[in-house]
Amino acid sequence: MAERSAPIGVMDSGVGGLSVLAEIQRLLPNETLLYVGDCGHIPYGEKSPDYIRERCRRIAGFFHEQGAKAMVLACNTATVAAVADLRELYPTWPLVGMEPAVKPAAAATRSGVVGVLATTGTLQSAKFAALLDRFANDVQVITQPCPGLVELIEAGDLVSPAVRQLLQGYVQPLLAAGCDTLILGCTHYPFLRPLLAGMVPDDVAIIDTGAAVARQLQRLLGANDLLAEGPAGAARFWTSADPEALRKILPVLWHKSDDVQSFAL
């Protein structure tokens, strides 16, 4: 059985999972966190499920070698493609994935119209269709794929005219259709929440699942007697792209400067 002091592995296709990592560290400050951003293979949203599964297997294997006690797939697209596969490979491992917040959005909407901003891979998945079938029968859900946003966020671009224009083009049709609740269905998108909030009326709710994932991780660790005790844990970072690129963006998205190592698998 893993030690309580063992680390937790958190992965994303790039830097979007840092939004989830922040929620985990906020809720579980004693945990040691290992973060792999698969930036050399981004964007996952345009890749095949088989390709994504293979990348997730490699990263999960790395976490296992590092002695991780649990893993978080901090990526909606990776969860869709690989979570079932990884649960078969590591049946005793607490493993938490992401999914768009359809259930809370359907409960929150007053107009009966919910908008979803996500990658093509997430929106076209059977898992997303099942979420709609289970939780959104009584509301209208309008989906909006958002090509280009992930790449801008990966570059640390959160406020430029280019990102503003692109986001506006994706959001305006949803507002015109009567959406009063917007789901951020990609872990990159919470970094654009301040920009998005300035584009929508005050009564439009913006929902993502980072905090809910942190709570689920806390529940699973507690149920397996794996919650860390003692001093505050640290975070360590790896990337499959140029480490210097992630080093430069960490102060923007993580609000701290940390060393970044190369992940060559």
Curated annotation (Swiss-Prot):
Molecular function GO labels: glutamate racemase activity
Positions annotated to bind substrate: D12, S13, Y44, G45, N76, T77, T187, H188
GO biological process entries: cell wall organization; peptidoglycan biosynthetic process; regulation of cell shape
Biochemical pathway: Cell wall biogenesis; peptidoglycan biosynthesis
Keyword Cytoplasm recorded: no
Domain of life: Bacteria
Highest classification ranks of the organism: Bacteria, Pseudomonadati, Pseudomonadota, Gammaproteobacteria, Pseudomonadales
Leading EC class: isomerase
Active-site residues, as the UniProt record annotates them: C75, C186
EC numbers for this chain: 5.1.1.3
Cross-referenced Pfam families: Asp_Glu_race (PF01177)
Catalyzed chemical reaction(s): L-glutamate = D-glutamate
Family to which the UniProt record says this protein belongs: Belongs to the aspartate/glutamate racemases family.
Key word Isomerase present: yes
Protein name: Glutamate racemase
SS bond list: none
PROSITE patterns cross-referenced by the UniProt entry: ASP_GLU_RACEMASE_1 (PS00923), ASP_GLU_RACEMASE_2 (PS00924)
Biological function: Provides the (R)-glutamate required for cell wall biosynthesis.
Record's keyword terms, sorted: Cell shape, Cell wall biogenesis/degradation, Isomerase, Peptidoglycan synthesis
Native organism: Pseudomonas putida (strain ATCC 47054 / DSM 6125 / CFBP 8728 / NCIMB 11950 / KT2440)
